[in-house]
């Protein structure tokens, strides 16, 4: 039997009512890729390019010059005839540094964009925690993903109607859109382990899953011990399935397991497809900006196009992704399922506490999350800082900034598809590939710091003194992002106890997005203090370097072994749910 071109070797035994154990098919994978194609444009084109400079420009049009704090900033986008003014001849005032007053506080217009991002990340972290219970249990995972996509894309489109007089409203729409994007990507990431777990190539493995063929007599009782002890899902189905020896036997001694290979491939394709879509839309946005004479309206118009793209291409994902329901969430006192959202939210916060406590037994997850906390903060902060630096201190126009992003994305596509080849040829473990990306990433802030060296400063170029220097740095940033985006996500998935994907991916996302509260805010503070962005490169260089020793300590084999053992222990404690699921299984 075949479905959408992929052979269906059999069906896994359901663990609870509504459990979707069908093998992953081509249409489901296309649905997963489709949302990356839809939403990655906001990450790359909006957050990575046009949204920060739109917020800065709208605030600038309502601000005053930092030099005298009375002269209004220009009301239109003005760039000198020659944008090649070297940094050493440009004071912050000459570079057009502007400030606005928000709640009586003096805020640099570049800092306004950074603070807006920090606030959105804080709200995003709270939202991600609150929804994780509904993502793990019941059939809400897909519904929430589509809902957040709709809200986020509409808010992005509404920025078109925002004028500089109400620039704070633009910041509000940006906060909502970025919050929804982050929440939707958490839900999308939680599908990845399920797509891998039910992938036909894994189901065909001799030592893999025991399956029930659809042609067999489904009326025969199937005991819960029909699963092999080598099955990574066995701990979810029986309380006394795996011993530590079993888990050690299950884990291959090779550098990369079959599951990690499939997970990395799917993740890399998803990132690559998303970047391809972003490159295409970015090209359209640049043409629109040039044709509309690079005004503030031009920036708002391209943000509308980004939101429209996000909305339209979410539709295939809404149709093709399977809900893949989780087990029902039962109340401890009566064993009945939760019916209200308040119940799900309360459970989610309690679950976060339990998940955080569980990580005490998972040394490698702790090490990875600590490293990822710092690394993801650096990734998010470098992107926004570079764009605002190029606009406010190198006086680059929107079209030029858009071209940098195109180069970055092309490099990202190349990186997403090539890092797996490089790691395979060099026989690198996933953690080693991530470390190589970190070393390459460190070059970006170090290059910016060259501008402080007097000998280089006197040259008038190098050390980010000329606009053209942003382009090669964009290539490096793209290569790094292509590798980190795919490898970190899939590598973390291998360290998660089976059956707890959404909870641990919520922790992953909170670590990722939550850390980004600090980096942009610190850069904003540095910018407010010094009147320019360049000193923030010292902070970024340290921030990117700190994850290295932590990542070096991560042991993938030990992490996977500990995760499987913990899953067994956790399932053994869930006696009520085990009885309910066991009764259901015996009725099959």
UniProtKB/Swiss-Prot annotation:
Keywords in alphabetical order: Amino-acid transport, Autophagy, Glycoprotein, Membrane, Transmembrane, Transmembrane helix, Transport, Vacuole
Transmembrane segments: 35-55, 109-129, 144-164, 168-188, 270-290, 301-321, 365-385, 399-419, 434-454, 471-493, 507-527, 536-556
GO CC terms, sorted: vacuolar membrane
Membrane-topology descriptor: Multi-pass membrane protein
InterPro entries referenced in this protein's UniProt entry, alphabetically: Atg22, Atg22-like, ATG22/LtaA_families, MFS_trans_sf
Entry keyword annotation includes Protein biosynthesis: no
Taxonomic source organism: Emericella nidulans (strain FGSC A4 / ATCC 38163 / CBS 112.46 / NRRL 194 / M139) (Aspergillus nidulans)
Superkingdom of the organism of origin: Eukaryota
Protein name in the entry: Autophagy-related protein 22-1
Keyword Mitochondrion applies: no
Glycosylation site list: 84, 255
Subcellular location: Vacuole membrane
One annotated GO biological process: autophagy
SUPFAM superfamilies in the cross-refs: MFS general substrate transporter
Function: Vacuolar effluxer which mediate the efflux of amino acids resulting from autophagic degradation. The release of autophagic amino acids allows the maintenance of protein synthesis and viability during nitrogen starvation.
Lineage, highest ranks first: Eukaryota, Fungi, Dikarya, Ascomycota, Pezizomycotina
Family classification: Belongs to the ATG22 family.
């Amino acid at each position: 039997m075949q479905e959408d071109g992929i052979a269906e070797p059999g069906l896994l035994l359901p663990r609870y009512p509504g459990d979707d154990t069908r093998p992953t098919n081509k249409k489901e994978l296309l649905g997963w890729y489709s949302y990356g194609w839809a939403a990655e444009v906001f990450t790359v084109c909006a957050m990575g390019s046009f949204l920060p400079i739109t917020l800065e420009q709208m605030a600038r049009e309502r601000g005053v010059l930092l030099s005298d704090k009375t002269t209004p900033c220009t009301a239109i986008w003005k760039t000198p005839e020659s944008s090649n003014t070297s940094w050493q001849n440009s004071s912050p005032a000459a570079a057009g540094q502007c400030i606005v007053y928000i709640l009586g506080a003096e805020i640099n217009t570049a800092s306004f964009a950074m603070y807006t991002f920090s606030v959105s990340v804080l709200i995003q972290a709270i939202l991600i925690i609150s929804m994780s219970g509904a993502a793990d249990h019941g059939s809400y995972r897909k519904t929430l993903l589509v809902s957040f996509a709709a809200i986020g894309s509409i808010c992005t489109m509404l920025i078109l109607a925002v004028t500089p007089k109400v620039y704070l409203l633009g910041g509000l729409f940006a906060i909502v859109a970025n919050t929804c994007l982050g929440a939707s990507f958490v839900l999308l990431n939680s599908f990845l382990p399920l797509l891998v777990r039910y992938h036909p190539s894994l189901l065909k493995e001799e030592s893999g899953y025991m399956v029930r063929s659809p042609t067999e007599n489904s009326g025969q009782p199937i005991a819960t011990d029909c699963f092999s002890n080598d099955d990574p899902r066995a701990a979810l189905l029986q309380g006394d399935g795996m011993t530590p020896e079993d888990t050690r036997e299950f884990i291959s001694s090779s550098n990369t397991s079959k599951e990690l290979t499939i997970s990395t491939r799917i993740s890399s394709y998803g990132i690559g497809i998303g970047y391809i879509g972003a490159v295409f839309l970015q090209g359209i946005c640049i043409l629109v900006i040039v044709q509309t004479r690079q005004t503030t309206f031009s920036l708002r118009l391209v943000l509308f196009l980004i939101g429209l793209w996000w909305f339209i291409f979410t539709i295939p994902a809404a149709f093709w992704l399977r809900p893949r329901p989780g087990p029902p969430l039962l109340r401890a006192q009566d064993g009945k399922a939760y019916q209200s959202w308040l119940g799900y939210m309360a459970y989610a916060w309690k679950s976060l506490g339990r998940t955080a406590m569980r990580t005490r037994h998972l040394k490698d997850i702790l090490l990875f999350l600590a490293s990822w906390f710092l690394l993801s903060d650096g990734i998010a902060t470098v992107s926004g800082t570079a764009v605002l630096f190029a606009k406010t201190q190198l006086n680059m126009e929107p079209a030029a900034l858009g071209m940098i992003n195109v180069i970055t994305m092309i490099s990202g596509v190349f990186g997403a598809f090539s890092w797996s080849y490089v790691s395979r040829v060099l026989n690198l473990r996933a953690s080693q590939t991530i470390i190589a990306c970190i070393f390459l990433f460190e070059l970006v802030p170090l290059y910016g710091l060259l501008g402080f060296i007097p000998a280089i400063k006197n040259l008038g170029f190098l050390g980010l003194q000329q606009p053209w220097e942003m382009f090669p740095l964009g290539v490096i940033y793209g290569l790094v992002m292509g590798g980190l985006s795919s490898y970190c996500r899939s590598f973390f998935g291998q360290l998660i106890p089976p059956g707890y994907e959404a909870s641990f991916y919520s922790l992953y996302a909170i670590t990722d997005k939550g850390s980004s509260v600090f980096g942009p805010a610190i850069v904003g503070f540095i910018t407010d203090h010094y009147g320019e962005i360049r000193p923030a490169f010292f902070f970024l260089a340290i921030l990117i370097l700190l994850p290295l020793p932590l990542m070096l300590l991560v042991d993938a084999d030990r992490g996977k072994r500990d995760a499987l053992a913990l899953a067994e222990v956790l399932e053994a404690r869930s006696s009520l749910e085990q009885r309910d699921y066991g009764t259901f299984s015996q009725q099959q």
